[in-house]
């Protein structure tokens, strides 16, 4: 199976998976043109589209892709029913695409109906878990996003986190403010800074790495809790997470 990221819009990535026969699936096509180019250049045969949530930069290309490939199955949560999804899925559902079995994981927070798709090792998590970061809370609550992170954090170390935006460098800058002496964060920051200076793509990332560099996955850390609050013992872990998200909003 071959994993490809297609840059789109300002900082989006549209993910594709294709097998050796050229059959492919498409994840969160925010626009159609770059996907159609990739299909033509690689002689792919699209089989399905996976949608994580209803925002335009994730669904904007669906209608045009369906005009070219009207038989495509478009999987998505209920909130995408008016955005082109023709096969609605929810938490715990399983779908079979390209010979892979994907489990649907409800990951509300960014939107109320946001979902992620997991078929080891691939995790398509939209705007929930970013490399070194966390999606903004447009509809859901910090507690919902925290609980979504806990679900994703149960996946194996070698999970490939295929998120939808190139935010890694700015997220690492935020992480570094809490852990200025952390050698792993510092090392990775310089690696990513060099990569981005050449317009390189920082994704996918592995969950094993994210557990080391992503402050939103380190809310159990007593050192971090003390930086967040003078009375961390009086806060639930999700409240530490919520405070981090508030600080990131104004960072």
UniProtKB/Swiss-Prot annotation:
Binding site for Zn(2+) 2: 57-58, 127, 165
Catalytic activity of the protein: an S-(2-hydroxyacyl)glutathione + H2O = a 2-hydroxy carboxylate + glutathione + H(+)
Pathway involvement of the protein, from the record: Secondary metabolite metabolism; methylglyoxal degradation; (R)-lactate from methylglyoxal: step 2/2
Domain of life: Bacteria
Coiled coil: none
EC id: 3.1.2.6
Family: Belongs to the metallo-beta-lactamase superfamily. Glyoxalase II family.
Protein name, entry field: Hydroxyacylglutathione hydrolase
Organism of this sequence: Erwinia tasmaniensis (strain DSM 17950 / CFBP 7177 / CIP 109463 / NCPPB 4357 / Et1/99)
């Amino acid at each position: 199976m071959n994993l490809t990221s297609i840059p789109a819009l300002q900082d989006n990535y549209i993910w594709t998976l294709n097998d050796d026969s050229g059959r492919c699936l498409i994840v969160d096509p925010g626009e159609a043109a770059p996907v159609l180019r990739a299909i033509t250049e690689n002689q792919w045969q699209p089989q399905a589209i996976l949608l994580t949530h209803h925002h335009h930069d994730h669904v904007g290309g669906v209608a045009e892709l369906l005009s070219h490939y009207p038989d495509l199955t478009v999987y998505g949560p209920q909130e995408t029913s008016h955005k082109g999804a023709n096969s609605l899925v929810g938490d715990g559902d399983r779908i079979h695409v390209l010979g892979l079995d994907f489990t649907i994981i409800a990951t509300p927070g960014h939107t109320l109906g946001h979902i992620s798709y997991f078929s080891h090792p691939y995790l398509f998590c939209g705007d929930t878990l970013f490399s070194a970061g966390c999606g903004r809370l447009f509809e859901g609550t910090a507690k919902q996003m925290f609980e979504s992170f806990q679900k994703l954090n149960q996946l194996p170390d070698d999970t490939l986190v295929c998120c939808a935006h190139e935010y890694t460098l700015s997220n690492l800058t935020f992480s570094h403010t809490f852990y200025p002496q952390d050698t792993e964060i510092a090392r990775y920051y310089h690696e990513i800074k060099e990569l981005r200076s050449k317009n390189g793509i920082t994704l996918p990332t592995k969950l094993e790495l994210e557990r080391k560099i992503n402050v939103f996955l380190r809310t159990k850390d007593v050192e971090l809790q003390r930086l967040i609050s003078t009375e961390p013992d009086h806060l639930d872990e999700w409240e530490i997470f919520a405070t981090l998200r508030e600080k990131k909003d104004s960072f």
